[in-house]
Amino acid sequence: MIRITKFRCNSFEELSYLVWAGNACVIIDPGFDSEAEFDALHKAIKENGITPSGILLTHAHPDHVYGVHRLCEEWGIPVYANRGEEVTLGALHALCANLGNSDVEDFSSRIKWIEDGDRIFVSENTACVRKADETGTITGMTGGLEFKVLSTPGHTAGGVCYLCREFRKASASEESKNERDAKERYGSTVASQEADKWKVLFSGDTLFAGCIGRSDLPGGDYTALMQGIFTKLLCLDGGIDVLPGHGPATTISEERMKNPFLQPFNEPYEE
């Protein structure tokens, strides 16, 4: 079962997520900016007996990355981000100064670049990336979390969203069948693992409940934002939960039907 703890962080009320299944664990968009916020994270980690294996960034605006450097130093873990965020990362100090907020310590040496369609597999104390065109098995992983990278620029130049589901190592009797149908069922997902349906979308500042991300900041692009939402997000299964970087959770179906920023493309209400 995927478990998620949400933390409201910093003066922007950014939402950071601790995500785990069994002993597989990651942190998404760690905006922790005070001792109280870090204490809340450490309490949740200790109570659940887990250790983060990586940090996933939807984008690199200050409110989403305040805690990255400290957490990387504490656990020695990598940071996954889209290479398009090099522009945002290069402007971090200026953005912090303009906002009048605390500065962000450099964490560039920890970054592992990801691209659209890549999959990040997380097991206990381990995380690795399978590129979109790679197949084959992942050795040493018996199960955990799988994230699929969806490139959704527009709020920033390298913004992404993450689909999330569990995976487990198939039994010996299942492996041959999985080898045959894994690509058909799961695209480029590794063949010797059996995965669940996608359960959750972490949408960062691309899609919110009843709203969309702003595109008037440096690196923003309204056309790209809308294209990403329509071609990458709204086509997903309607039952997928959407956990954004700010505000309440929603679902793909809710946003298809009710989001006023997506008119006149809303679906009709279902009776």
Question: Where are the predicted features?
Answer:
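Conserved Rossmann-like nucleotide-binding pocket used by diverse enzymes
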Residues: R3, L56, K148
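A secondary-structure boundary/capping signal
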Residues: R8, T58, N82, S203-G204
